[in-house]
């Protein structure tokens, strides 16, 4: 058998790198396999890649060095001249400064005002001046009222009368003790009348039905 297998002719597949029977059926079946087709595709890709590299090398050799230098300088000049566009931010309006207590000028004494120039003007807030005036008017009115004792008495009397008028609707009425025994007598008379009426009432008994009569008669018969 070994001699027989050795006698069969074989060929070497350079794509798959294996030996195959040199018969038309065996060769056709091997070429139709996925492994053989994938190996052929890889070889063709390598050939195509090597051809592209060779073409690039030929182009680089054909271009002179002076041309490459000029292109490089042109590119560098373009990059140097390029500047990023500046962003234009919107202009912000300056905020108005609010007036504070530190900005107000306080008036000084007569000795200090002599040295200050005539153009300098002092400013006092109007609210403080008004409050001081109101306090002064209150003090004057209180002093006047204390000096006139008669007026204060009249005023107190008027206030008391007004309070009495306002509390007129809420006065408590006094109880009359004379009416209390009369109410007790009336209640006693009513209770007596109710007792008499209960005594005079006639009580009507309900008639028994036929079944109840028979039951009661049977009970009486058994007892006898």
Swiss-Prot record:
GO CC terms, sorted: nucleolus; nucleus; precatalytic spliceosome; U2-type precatalytic spliceosome
Basic and acidic residues bias locations: 175-199
Primary localization: nucleus
One Pfam family it belongs to: zf-U1
Stored SMART domains: ZnF_U1 (SM00451)
Keyword annotations of the record: Metal-binding, Nucleus, Zinc, Zinc-finger
Compositionally biased intervals (Basic residues): 87-98, 203-216
PROSITE patterns: ZF_MATRIN (PS50171)
Zn finger intervals (Matrin-type): 11-42
GO molecular function, one term: RNA binding
NAD in keyword set: no
InterPro entries (alphabetical): Matrin/U1-C_Znf_C2H2 (IPR000690), Matrin/U1-like-C_Znf_C2H2 (IPR003604), U1-CZ_Znf_C2H2 (IPR013085), WBP4 (IPR040023), Znf_C2H2_sf (IPR036236)
Disulfide-bonded cysteines: none
Single GO BP term: RNA splicing
Disordered: region residues: 67-158, 172-224
Composition-biased stretches (Low complexity): 67-80, 108-122
Annotated compartments: Nucleus, Nucleolus
Protein name: Uncharacterized protein C18H10.07
